[in-house]
Every structure is written in structure tokens, then in C-alpha cells.
Amino acid sequence: MARARGVVLGYRRGTNTQYPQHALVKLLLDDPRKAGLYVSGIAFYRDRYGNVYKGRVLRLHGRRGGVVVVKFNPPLPGQATGGVVEVVKAGGDG
């Protein structure tokens, strides 16, 4: 199973609206164009208290940056910005 690490950049937001359940995650890959392979994968974030937040990779954000949109339930806290996320690729083959 393919795994990748990523960094939480912040919430998806607009001019007047913020979506705390949607986090922008920059995947740390050798080739950022391969971020699309992780769409529909599962993301995990663990805070310093041991709480685990689970989310699903919804789509790419931007064209070539290696950034994806992840929907977490429950939403990530604001302190997660800059934290490390582990993303597991969907499918069994890897």
C-alpha cells in the first residue's frame, strides 16, 4: 500500500467563508504531479494528545503543486496547521 506524508496548509476558504472540515494538504512527493494518485485515499492526523482525525482525499487543489483537499470528520482544529498528515493510497495494489 502506497503511503505519503503531507503538511496541513490550512482550511479551504473563500473571500467571506471558511470551510473547517476541508483541509488543504501539501503532499511531500518526489514528483508533485503524482498527487492525483492519492485522490479517494485516506488521510490520518494525530495530535499531541493522541487523538486521531481521519479524512478522505477529495480532489486536487491547483494544477501542479501537489496540494490536495482532504475532508476530515470531525474537522481538524486550527492548531493542526503545519502538522504532519499521513495519506494512504486507495486500492489494494499500491
Curated annotation (Swiss-Prot):
Q: What Gene3D superfamilies does this protein map onto?
A: translation elongation factor selb, chain A, domain 4
For the keyword Ribonucleoprotein, the answer is yes
Q: What is stated as this protein's family in its record?
A: Belongs to the eukaryotic ribosomal protein eL33 family.
Task: Kindly state which keywords UniProt assigns to this record, in alphabetical order.
Answer: Ribonucleoprotein, Ribosomal protein
Query: Has the keyword Ribosomal protein been applied to this entry?
Result: yes
Biological process (GO) annotations held by this record are: translation
What GO terms are given for molecular function?
A: structural constituent of ribosome
| InterPro entries reported in the protein's UniProt record | Ribosomal_eL33 (IPR001780), Ribosomal_eL33_sf (IPR038661), Transl_B-barrel_sf (IPR009000)
Q: What is this protein called?
A: Large ribosomal subunit protein eL33
Native species: Aeropyrum pernix (strain ATCC 700893 / DSM 11879 / JCM 9820 / NBRC 100138 / K1)
Name the encoding gene, please.
Answer: rpl35ae
What HAMAP family does the record point to? Answer: Ribosomal_eL33
Q: What Gene Ontology cellular component terms go with this record?
A: ribonucleoprotein complex; ribosome
One Pfam family from the UniProt entry?
Ribosomal_L35Ae
